[in-house]
Amino acid sequence: MFTNTPVGGKRERQNGAHPAWSTLGANSAQIHQNTADLASKMHKLRYTKIRSPPTRVSIESITPKQRFPAPNFEQAYHSNIRYEQEESDNEEFENVVKNGHEASTNVFYESDGDDEEFVNEEYENSIDEESDDEGYSLNEDTTATNASFRYPMNQRSTRKSQFYSSKFKPLLWFGITLFSTLLIITLLHKGQEFYSRSFSSDNSQPSNSPVPNIPPASNDTKTSLKPDIIKDFTDSPSKVGGNEEFDYSTGDLITKKEFDKILQQKVEQLKQSLKEEMSNYKSSVPFEVELNDDWKFFIESTVRKYLTDPVSMPNFALLSTGAEVLPALTSKRYVRRPSAFIPRFTSYFFDSLVVRGHEPSIALTPNNAVAMCWSFQGSEGQLGISLSRPVYVTNVTIEHVQHKIAHDLSSAPKDFELWVQGMSSKMFVLLGKARYSLTEDSIQTFSFESSNYIVAEPIQNVILKIKSNWGNPNYTCLYQVRVHGTVPNADEQPIPSLGEKAESTAENTGQDSS
């Protein structure tokens, strides 16, 4: 706290005080009076401007050219206030001595908000010398500007109200605009409905002509429309609609029974006219086309053949008869994921984002519907099949969707190879190559009967290798594969292979030479 204790006395001079302090007075009483006046003025100025606690003798001056962080007096300061670097005590007293004991302070106070701004202003306030109160309790300016500094809570509430007004004012205007727009739209809609109703009610009358006053219909007018029908309806409704004929072209009022009778007459007339037209058409046809027995037999046999099976050969690669897919020798089915990074990453956790083809086993079922096929990635793949029983393979059938109903024929297989494995062999042997054509029928059978001598025993496993397709770079579709052959008998000798034929030929040649 501030006291009137002299500072420029003997003790300070003995402790190495600045020489400029000695010029404040010749003796201790004068020094005491001068330093007390100076401290009171400077203390009052500092507390009024920047709300700092009082000091004993001097305060550090704030200049606009030098910047320094605000001193920490354990009070709450706003973070947006910037303070300048203050002068030391010695520099302050040197300036005081040079300026003739006039305490002046240059204050530079800024803020980013709506706070007040003070730049290079001098404040000199009178001091009641007879008062022994503290420096900050002397005569102070009670204007609104100084009051805001003495009471920072008022200034904070002002800033808070300004903040809320600046934030919520656009929302308020937006709400008013929206309400006005909705009100205008509602009024226009109601006005349109009112105008349409008034226009429909006055459609028969021009807008510029007065509406005539039509008197209400009297009972005499109502009964004059058709008095006999009204009389019959009121006396006995069952009598109305007898066998008498009605003139319905006059536009008179009729009952429901009369209308039903008229409608029935019209329907009978239409039926009669239709029968006459059909009889005239039959009489105009000169003769009927009659087929002989040969043509009938040919058509029936052809239809029966294609209704049962167009190939008419046993299929040993049918899933329902015991054939199986060899997963280790079969390519993976086609899987398509999104191309973007985030959906592609998400597709590994959510299967709904992935497009997957059918399993390879669908190629062993007789289903020729569109898209009911086994699809694999790219244009090359293979399908390993374990036949339902060991056979001598003679034919292979490749089936694709009908060309007339296919969406895209570029995914059909083109070149393929057939590899086979005997019952006691561990190696697969190439049985032959072929090409599926798009210009021929959708079900094409290829013969491999001339290559049976390559394998000497019945075949259990086959591999169909697709080498290319008809232009689709993404996937290839295979609808159905059929493997045909002959079943070996129990006492039948196995067909000699090409190697066995060479060995037997060499043995016969050796016996002849001996």
UniProtKB/Swiss-Prot annotation:
Composition bias of kind Low complexity appears in 198-219
UniProt KW Membrane keyword: yes
Ranges for domain SUN:
322-488
Show the GO MF annotations: protein-macromolecule adaptor activity; protein-membrane adaptor activity; spindle pole body-nuclear membrane anchor activity
Q: Give the way it sits in the membrane.
A: Single-pass membrane protein
* Residues modified to Phosphoserine: 236
PROSITE patterns tied to this protein: SUN
Domain of life (superkingdom): Eukaryota
Report the function annotation for this chain: Associates with the spindle pole body and maintains a functional interface between the nuclear membrane and the microtubule motor proteins. Involved in chromosome segregation during meiosis where it associates with the telomeres.
On assembly, the entry states: Interacts with bqt1. The bqt1-bqt2-sad1 complex binds rap1. Also interacts with cdc31.
Q: What is this protein called?
A: Spindle pole body-associated protein sad1
What organism does the UniProt record list as the source?
Answer: Schizosaccharomyces pombe (strain 972 / ATCC 24843) (Fission yeast)
